[in-house]
Amino acid sequence: MKTVKKVNFNGQPFHFIGIGGIGMSALAYILAERNLPVSGSDLRPTHITQRLQGAGAHIFHRQEANNLALFHSPGPQNSSQTVPQVICSTAINDHNKEYQAARDLGYPIFHRSDVLAALIADYDSIAVAGTHGKTTTSSLIGYVLLEAGLDPTIIVGGEVDAWEGNARLGQGRFLVAEADESDGSLTKHAPKIGVITNIELDHPDHYQNLSEVIDTFHEFAHQCQILVACLDCDTIAEHFRPTISYSLDPEKGADYTVSEIIYEQGMMKASVWEKGSYLGQMEVKIPGQHNISNALAVVAIGRYLGLEFAVIADAIATFAGAKRRFEHKGEANGITFIDDYAHHPSELLATLAAAKLKVEGKQYQRSIAIFQPHRYSRTTAFLEEFGSAFSSADVVVLTDIYSAGEVNINHVTGQQVAEQVRKHHKNAYYHPELSSLGQFLLEILQPGDLALFLGAGNLNQVIPEMLSLYREQLAVRV
């Protein structure tokens, strides 16, 4: 287990460098809701920083050393009550002015994972890990516990309408948290219940190979009192021995499994089995077999906590999903617009397969995949896999790569991704610039299309523009 620094929750201030990020803001929100002094910097105001301000956090829209002085009060030099605990993510480097000032002044500096680990230790915690499905699974666990009256604290990597953001502070004994493996900090967490949805090589900026990823998950698994894991992942089935297992395949001998998966009237439906005994039918709003799997993990956890299956199933049936996870953004000119965070080849395959269910269920004419590759390192590592990831789409449009702050040391481009896709797909287009993508898509999209905007970058910003363009066209016709 990695050494976890001691975080002070007894009144010492917190200052977050880059407080508007999805992971940082969730932690800051919980601390502010606990009535702890919280400040942070982010270069531009967003609805996330506005929510933090509403919770009592002080937000600076500049990054400079003076920001650290907000809560500094007279007293013994560097007294625990007079200086802030400075919180950083992996994205913050030594050149950041606030980081430099905190280091030079001897202020305590923590990685955001240290704060999450300390919060996990404060509760009966459920931590959800895995290469894919973390946000949906952790959000759904939180939602089920909330609907069951257990009033959980929730920290996830996406925004959920049920608690109007990416975090909520409850008064119950449970904390549900999304546990990120991307930088190896997963090994700091020791929850009561750990969940592993699947394990694949991702984040090649940190991991050299799958073996290193497995080692990280192994260390996490050993620190969980109860491990819940999916046997549909070959890596898990081969290398892990979960306390509680689940699988979509009844032949794998898992504790929880399903049969008779169907798509009907906009819902995924499946019969659920617990150690060979029939529990009942489960309905899931968010499409795709991978979301049946995510929901099955939630059933396993709910049952372990003593919840009746009917309570769990009723909650699952009303869960609308997290934002940017097959999120319906609107309709215009007979075209349906979907925003999804998929950015790994496996995620793209799963999302586009789910879109096919939607096409059959809603009778859309075509599925149009608009994809923005995310990070140069990931694009380089999975270039060939991206080529074959779009087989379920009728048309593919690719943009240039969203860097996420990386340096392009391998000189990889979106054009190369497009070339790989064209080896497998005859209707693939490359349009690098987002600034003119909306106009380009006007020439491609047709009434009856399902337009899927895919990626973890800023591609989804084009969707409001598209909706506006179609409204303008309609106004001109009228």
UniProtKB/Swiss-Prot annotation:
Functional pathway: Cell wall biogenesis; peptidoglycan biosynthesis
Binding site for ATP: 130-136
HAMAP family recorded: MurC (MF_00046)
Record-stated family: Belongs to the MurCDEF family.
Alphabetical keyword list: ATP-binding, Cell cycle, Cell division, Cell shape, Cell wall biogenesis/degradation, Cytoplasm, Ligase, Nucleotide-binding, Peptidoglycan synthesis
Example of a GO MF term: UDP-N-acetylmuramate-L-alanine ligase activity
Name of the protein described by the UniProt record: UDP-N-acetylmuramate--L-alanine ligase
Name of encoding gene: murC
GO cellular component terms, semicolon-separated: cytoplasm
EC number: 6.3.2.8
Gene3D superfamilies with a match to the protein in the record: Mur ligase, C-terminal domain (3.90.190.20), Mur-like, catalytic domain (3.40.1190.10), NAD(P)-binding Rossmann-like Domain (3.40.50.720)
Chief location category: cytoplasm
Domain of life: Bacteria
Localisation per UniProt entry: Cytoplasm
Enzymatic reactions: UDP-N-acetyl-alpha-D-muramate + L-alanine + ATP = UDP-N-acetyl-alpha-D-muramoyl-L-alanine + ADP + phosphate + H(+)
InterPro entries: Mur-like_cat_sf, Mur_ligase_C, Mur_ligase_C_dom_sf, Mur_ligase_cen, Mur_ligase_N, MurCDEF_pg_biosynth, UDP-N-AcMur_Ala_ligase_MurC
Biological processes annotated in GO: cell division; cell wall organization; peptidoglycan biosynthetic process; regulation of cell shape
Function summary: Cell wall formation.
Keyword Cell wall biogenesis/degradation: yes
